[in-house]
Amino acid sequence: MSERVISPEPVPDDADEITLRPSTLEAFVGQEPAKNALRIAIAAARKRGEPIDHILFAGPPGLGKTTLAHIIAREMGAAIRTTTGPVLEKTGDMAAIATALQNGDVLFIDEIHRMNPVVEEILYPAMEDFFIDVMIGEGPSARSIKLTLERFTLIGATTRQGLLSSPFRDRFGLLIRLNLYSPEDLEKIVTRSAEILRIPITPKGAAVIASRSRGTPRIANRLLRRVRDYAVVEGDGTITAEIAGAGLALLQIDELGLDDIDRRILSVIAGDFGGGPVGAKTIAISVGEEVRTIEEVYEPYLIQIGFVKRTPQGRETTPAALAHLKLNHSQKTLF
């Protein structure tokens, strides 16, 4: 599923994503509550002459968690070391990284919810008291060595906050939730990215792309690049509202940012099963996808926009979904 045009996860086409990232909070568009909290935390830490407190970013993928981590390090004048939860399999992996950190450094762990629980546990004293205990040797001769660490800031990013243990979450001084962006903020992001990439675009062209980006900057930037290609081939290179609409239609992305598989899922529930309820396994079989893909990739956005409801009996479509699909099926009434 990594090649899906409207996937919020990174795909190979996103090679210039780093170029488009803002480098300051001032340049970062949207997420005002998060930015306000970070401004205060950064200013307070700098006045005290201390590293900023540990921070956990939570929210859907593609909203700027990694970008904000780099901005924090930059505004604190700190070096940043980045890694991901899945690669931290052993305590030795974390010990090697932690002991190399200098005073004030930022350690950013993406997908922190996928970190080995054993590694998570050695972070407890590292986050609170800046030391870790490492076991040397095996069997009866094994012994614990205490390694003192420099004061550092841990920034974690997660799309599944509920998978983190309560003791781990409680050790973060700031827990910041990022939400889907408004069309207005996405329009600003598209316009900014077009300027950086030197893509001619009209305000209405930017608005069309923004409205179909599922509230996610990563998707907005990806669609901008795809529509740029269409504008060069089918137009004069300028992205107008008409060019944007036609280019996205060619990609089978409708006015709400739904693609063909999204619509097939809705059609299965609404058309084949009378509006539901229907189980995820049945939906997955009907559209030729895995259950996990349905639950983690497609379903969240359909729920967020109010097209699908989860019930104890299964998934149901809403009247809004039926109106979008232009279906007249009546939803089942559950007793």
UniProtKB/Swiss-Prot annotation:
Cellular component terms (Gene Ontology): cytoplasm; Holliday junction resolvase complex
GO biological process: DNA recombination; DNA repair
Binding site for DNA: 310, 315
Pfam family, one: RuvB_C
Record keywords, A-Z: ATP-binding, Cytoplasm, DNA damage, DNA recombination, DNA repair, DNA-binding, Hydrolase, Nucleotide-binding
Catalytic activity: ATP + H2O = ADP + phosphate + H(+)
Chain segments carrying region Small ATPAse domain (RuvB-S): 182-252
Disulfide-bonded cysteines: none
Coarse class of the protein's main subcellular location: cytoplasm
Region (Head domain (RuvB-H)) location: 255-335
Protein residues bound to Mg(2+): 66
UniProt cross-references to HAMAP family, sorted A to Z: DNA_HJ_migration_RuvB
Subunit structure comment from the entry: Homohexamer. Forms an RuvA(8)-RuvB(12)-Holliday junction (HJ) complex. HJ DNA is sandwiched between 2 RuvA tetramers; dsDNA enters through RuvA and exits via RuvB. An RuvB hexamer assembles on each DNA strand where it exits the tetramer. Each RuvB hexamer is contacted by two RuvA subunits (via domain III) on 2 adjacent RuvB subunits; this complex drives branch migration. In the full resolvosome a probable DNA-RuvA(4)-RuvB(12)-RuvC(2) complex forms which resolves the HJ.
Protein name: Holliday junction branch migration complex subunit RuvB
